[in-house]
Amino acid sequence: MAEVICLGIAVLDHVFQMQELPQSPVKHFANDYRAVGGGNAATAAVAVARAGGNATFIGRLGNDPNAQILLDELTGYGVDVSHTRLIDGANSGVSAVLIDENGERMIVNHADPKLDFNPSWLQEELSMLDGRSKIAALADLRWKAGAEALLARAKMAGLPAVLDIDLNPEGFTDSVLRCATHALFSKPALTQYAGTENHQVALHVARERLECWVGFTAGSEGAFWLDGCQLRHQPGVEIKAVDTLGAGDVFHGTFALGLAEGLEIPHAMRFASVAAALKCSRFGGRDAIPSRSEIEMTL
């Protein structure tokens, strides 16, 4: 069975279902509420497990009640959380998420700066990559030092090293991005990184700077990547979107799993696109992430 090591953030999402997203600074009322686990790498790990892979989550949480909620949920989905570190005196990440009736979302996140940024403790954890096949690494950018350590180790071992590149308040650090074998941007992040809204030009800029495979996700428009000098496109799967929260994380997780299984890029992109679309087609947080059989039936 293929495996993906996912490193990055896990947060507790407080999700409010609303008719429309707020436009004014007054009191607003939600139609529904739920608290669910979120975070790029953590949700990607759940997607890997749901799609039939072995999933490991590596991250940092505060030593607080929210951490136990998050770890229990991940464990319930079959994710190995034994390599996650709890930090005394720090708070686990939390987000307020507003979702409108079209599935579009607004997110306010808090990440405690007291979470330990030193990745030295990872060296023993990352030995699981050595001498392995059918395994890939996936990291988000919310813990850059950890992402650099994981991706560099995977790349050195000749394994797929996938970086989830989303909008980042701290900007981008090329020394981290260059550790990836596969740099997968969100559409806004690619524009921010390359300084142009011409996405074909932006991909060429990114590839020249990073010297690796580059692509980006664009929601319902699908996903795009460079194949030599050619721009390739995986169209979005037509669905009625009701909840887009975590769709990009599902895409990244299942894309990394596809690479770990040895799929060629077009097939891995199709696999990930179907998984992300199915997730958007239903409400329910991580329970809405599709199983392997559901993905294959749609494929």
Give residue ranges: language-model regions.
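Gly/Ala-rich phosphate-binding loop of Rossmann-like dinucleotide-binding domains
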Residues: 49, 155, 260
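Residues at secondary-structure transition points
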Residues: 28-39, 43, 65, 87-91, ...
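Conserved phosphate-binding/catalytic region of the ribokinase-like
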Residues: 1-4, 199-299
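Glycine-rich phosphate/adenosyl-contacting loop at the front of the ribokinase-like
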Residues: 1-60, 65-69, 76
